[in-house]
């Protein structure tokens, strides 16, 4: 799903053009040299490898999907000399190794899948050190209110969607969850240039679940993703 990758000349054209999101977040990263970083919902590790080039001390990827963890490990098998990067088959809520206080946490594309968004934000707060940073990327609602997707319903074809917050409501929730210096640094609308079917992922993708006017098949406004940067109080 995430990529692209080039492995010994083999071009893996992933469903997501993940370098586009990387370009959006890169300029808002703190100086991460020497930092301990958690990449929540890391998938196959694409963003972890991008972060690795900025010389952190440690990156811990977490993902509950076994296939993504296996993909992560398959890629890492070609880079055995890299000891600063590892992946764990768990969520941020399940991670309980209290000896690590992370300097930076990335949670991208996770919050709207959470059954309990407050619990997810609290887990980030407990993992990051005081004054440490989080980068939270999530779909946001351009309607006057949150979008609450009911059980067995979909949003842009996606299942297991909970609440899609307005930017103001998410800002308020982050404040009440113990974060400060909250900034919305980027808004972008997903399109079929960034997410699409390829020979490596030949199932249905973004364009199959959206209308010509940009709305989703379910009638929601165009899919907007927002990037929040904040620090723990």
Where are these regions (language model features)?
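Conserved class I S-adenosyl-L-methionine
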Residues: 35-43
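Conserved SAM-binding loop of SAM-dependent methyltransferases across substrates and taxa
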Residues: 44-55
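A short acidic, Gly/Pro-enriched loop at the edge of an enzyme's catalytic core
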Residues: 95-105
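A short SAM/SAH-binding and catalytic strip from SAM-dependent methyltransferases
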Residues: 103-116
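A short glycine-rich, Lys/Arg-flanked "PGG" loop and its adjoining helix->strand segment in the class I
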Residues: 118-133
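Short, glycine-/aromatic-enriched active-site segment of Class I SAM-dependent methyltransferases
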Residues: 139-161
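Short alpha-helix
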Residues: 161-178
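Conserved catalytic loop of SAM-dependent methyltransferase domains
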Residues: 180-208
């Amino acid at each position: 799903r995430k990529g692209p990758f080039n492995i010994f000349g083999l071009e893996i054209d992933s469903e997501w053009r993940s370098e586009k999101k990387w370009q959006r977040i890169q300029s808002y990263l703190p100086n991460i040299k020497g930092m301990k970083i958690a990449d929540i919902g890391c998938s196959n590790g694409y963003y972890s490898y991008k972060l690795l080039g900025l010389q952190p001390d440690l990156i811990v990827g977490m993902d509950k999907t076994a296939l993504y963890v296996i993909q992560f490990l398959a890629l890492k098998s070609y880079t055995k000399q890299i000891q600063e990067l590892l992946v764990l088959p768990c969520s941020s809520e399940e991670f309980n190794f209290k000896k690590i206080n992370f300097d930076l946490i990335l949670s991208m594309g996770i919050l709207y899948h959470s059954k309990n968004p407050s619990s997810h934000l609290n887990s980030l707060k407990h993992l990051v050190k005081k004054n440490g940073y989080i980068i939270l990327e999530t779909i946001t609602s351009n309607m006057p209110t949150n979008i609450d997707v009911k059980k067995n319903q979909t949003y842009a074809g996606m299942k297991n969607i909970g609440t899609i917050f307005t930017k103001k409501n998410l800002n308020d929730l982050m404040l009440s969850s113990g974060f400060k210096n909250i900034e919305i640094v980027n808004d972008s609308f997903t399109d079929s240039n960034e997410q699409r079917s390829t020979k490596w992922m030949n199932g249905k993708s973004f364009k199959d679940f959206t209308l010509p006017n940009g709305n989703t098949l379910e009638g929601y406004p165009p899919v907007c993703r927002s990037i929040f940067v904040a620090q723990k109080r």
